[in-house]
Amino acid sequence: MTKLSKRVQALRTKVDRNRTYPVTEALALVKECATAKFDESIDIAVNLGIDARKSDQLVRGSVVLPAGTGKSVRVAVFAQGDKAEAARAAGADVVGFEDLAEQVKAGNIDFDLCIATPDAMRVVGQLGQILGPRGLMPNPKVGTVTMDVTTAVKNAKAGQVQYRTDKGGIIHATIGRASFSTEALQQNLGALVDALVKAKPAASKGIYLRRVALSSTMGSGVRVEPSSINAA
């Protein structure tokens, strides 16, 4: 245990907390510091130049990461008729309507993401107190309330991540695993940042991407030079 601690400490000394790294170097450092016995997630925190107290500056949406997330996602779909069949054909793990709502009320929540057709929201809306705290409530802003359930399910399975600013105006997301290549992580990071830039509120003034930091589950944070992300 002592040897492991010394090794981790040695790796962490490689990270200069006062330096902002080019994205390729930052990703290499984060991967090098991911020494846990499990495949650590690679996480990003983006501090945006918004006023998080104002509703018109809330940044929320979703993006499909080109290299995936490295995680298997169980998808539930609230739909009926042809849309239910389309959801099953697209690979949804759980499909139902009022019967699925009863399962949720009974505490049987065996899924990681929830999609609903607009007409199903009269049923799903009654589950707000159950799904909301778990981050599972469908929302049109992230593409989980839609008539196009086929695309929604396929995107979820392909590696779609949702993002939303917290009270401090920071976006937290996972862009992959330590086992991913630097190139794959860079592709995912670029896709997420592109999505954030496109979602910039009109009322946001000044520098938008104020600070970007990467870390693994158990590793140190590494600051990234924002201008290097899409230029690399």
Swiss-Prot record:
GO process terms (BP): regulation of translation; translation
A GO cellular-component term linked to this record: cytosolic large ribosomal subunit
Keywords: Repressor, Ribonucleoprotein, Ribosomal protein, RNA-binding, rRNA-binding, Translation regulation, tRNA-binding
Keyword Repressor on entry: yes
One MF annotation (Gene Ontology) recorded for this entry: structural constituent of ribosome
Taxonomic superkingdom: Bacteria
Transmembrane segments: none
SUPFAM superfamilies according to UniProt: Ribosomal protein L1 (SSF56808)
InterPro entries, A to Z: Ribosom_uL1_bac-type (IPR005878), Ribosomal_uL1 (IPR002143), Ribosomal_uL1-like (IPR023674), Ribosomal_uL1/biogenesis (IPR028364), Ribosomal_uL1_3-a/b-sand (IPR016095), Ribosomal_uL1_CS (IPR023673)
Entry coiled-coil feature ranges: none
Family membership: Belongs to the universal ribosomal protein uL1 family.
Biological role stated in the UniProt entry: Binds directly to 23S rRNA. The L1 stalk is quite mobile in the ribosome, and is involved in E site tRNA release.
PANTHER family xref list: 54S RIBOSOMAL PROTEIN L1, MITOCHONDRIAL (PTHR36427), LARGE RIBOSOMAL SUBUNIT PROTEIN UL1M (PTHR36427:SF3)
Quaternary structure (record): Part of the 50S ribosomal subunit.
Stored HAMAP family: Ribosomal_uL1_B (MF_01318_B)
Name the record gives this protein: Large ribosomal subunit protein uL1
Organism phylogeny: Bacteria, Pseudomonadati, Pseudomonadota, Betaproteobacteria, Rhodocyclales
